[in-house]
A protein has these predicted regions:
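Class I (Rossmann-like) S-adenosyl-L-methionine-dependent methyltransferase catalytic domain
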Residues: 1-51, 77, 91-185
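A conserved beta-strand element that flanks and buttresses the S-adenosyl-L-methionine
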Residues: 61
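Short catalytic micro-motifs in class I SAM-dependent methyltransferases
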Residues: 64-68
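A short, conserved alpha-helix within the catalytic core of class I
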Residues: 69-81, 94
């Protein structure tokens, strides 16, 4: 019974992550593309090197894997390697270490699970200072998973192509610049 509940929760998380990815970047994301191979098949050597050419894929997805890659430095190396093989960017999801169900499901890797601050510190040291955005998915009212989008080219970021907000939406004040609290939709 408890395992069925866990399986249903994981399936729901996968579906919500696929929907979030689809809405977040506008590409056609399917759950089958978010499936991982058996973690036992992953290379165990310290150097993270994937057998692909530079920029071989448009987008690279890494679903609930980064937290299994040892310490912080090795996880940063994994992010760098994912960026190397991606032309446009990467999508990374990871369980939130603050979610009670996640702590119960993964007690052996709880110390390596992430929160928003640890994800930010990893992205801040990536080469080229890429554009990135961090989001989350809620399960039972708690942030259960974080998802990270990193664009290699700032010009490809969706915000670079957004239409300016209509003049009627801007705050009153004539030619004064908008306040720091105001942002176009």
């Amino acid at each position: 019974m408890p395992f069925e509940l866990i399986e249903r929760a994981q399936q729901r998380c996968r579906q919500r992550l696929a929907q979030a990815f689809d809405a977040f970047c506008g590409d056609d994301a399917r759950q089958s593309r978010l499936e991982l191979r058996d973690p036992e098949q992953l290379p165990s050597h310290e150097r993270v090197r994937l057998p692909y050419e530079d920029g071989e894929f448009d987008w690279v997805a890494c679903h609930e894997l980064i937290e299994t890659f040892g310490g912080h430095e090795r996880q940063v190396r994994l992010l760098r390697e994912l960026l190397r093989i991606a032309r446009r960017g990467i999508f990374v999801s990871t369980p939130n270490r603050g979610h009670p169900l996640v702590r119960w499901m993964y007690p052996e890797r709880h110390a390596r699970l992430h929160d928003a601050l640890t994800i930010k510190t990893m992205v801040d040291v990536l080469p080229g200072r890429p554009v990135w955005k961090l989001g989350h998915v809620r399960l039972a009212g708690f942030k259960s998973h974080y998802f990270l989008m990193v664009w290699k080219d700032a010009a490809a970021h969706p915000a670079q192509h957004a239409e300016p907000a209509p003049q009627a939406d801007r705050p009153a004040g004539g030619t004064e610049p908008p306040s720091a609290a105001w942002r176009p939709r």
